[in-house]
């Protein structure tokens, strides 16, 4: 059973490590798990619980610094007499959604914060229980050690995965907003680079062939989107076309674009701050 337990713990460790960024966090995880391996130590679960709780605390503090949580538009102190007191739940919330509003998280990102927060809070409460050495928490049997430590690490890993999932969904939302902006740029606004080529033009579609992140700071993401826009050029009026005096041709033109997307603001949403789209019509004149 002990070998089976060690394999379980090692598997969980390998799953958790990629989410830890600092050498301190990684060393603390290693030290926490080392406590569990010492079968002769009657305090092994207590020592593990203390180290694991501190790891979670440091991880949350890194992802949700005091100043950021306090400035989040959704933040309200639980105790008006302690306006700068931050609860564990508020740190968990910031780690997952940052400045984004609850409405945006629920309806756009589709993330259930309550379930994740509840599971992690339960795990931390379990850890706290074993950091207090009492007769019932001292020298516990291997089955209890296995059950408690496994559930705690599973909930911790689930929390880490939720944060990563939130980041991925923010990225997907940014991509979707860029696509919507390109629709507006090509289908609603008049593109002078295309308009000068014919009497009338019609956009048939566009294709983004490359979308890359150029830069990211604590408020904005700068994205670059390159691709092609397919257009139909009409020479002559609609009347000319009916009389057979006009003509239409279809061409494909390359475009490049840059977008600055704001993801951290007091509106609690994600929106495009600026968009620059350039269509290259040089190939038309070659």
How would you label these PLM feature ranges?
Residues 1-46:
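Charged alpha-helical initiation segments
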Residues 24-27, 43-54, 115-118, 122, ...:
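Short, well-structured alpha-helical interface segments that form or flank functional binding sites
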Residues 33, 44-67:
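Short, hydrophobic, well-ordered secondary-structure elements
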Residues 60-72, 136-141, 158-169, 236-240:
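Short, solvent-exposed secondary-structure capping/transition elements
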Residues 68-113:
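Short, charged amphipathic alpha-helical segments flanked by flexible coils
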Residues 97-123, 209-216:
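Short, mixed-charge amphipathic alpha-helical segments
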Residues 113-161:
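Charge-enriched, short contiguous segments at helix-coil
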Residues 152-286:
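Cystatin/cathelin-like cysteine-protease inhibitor module
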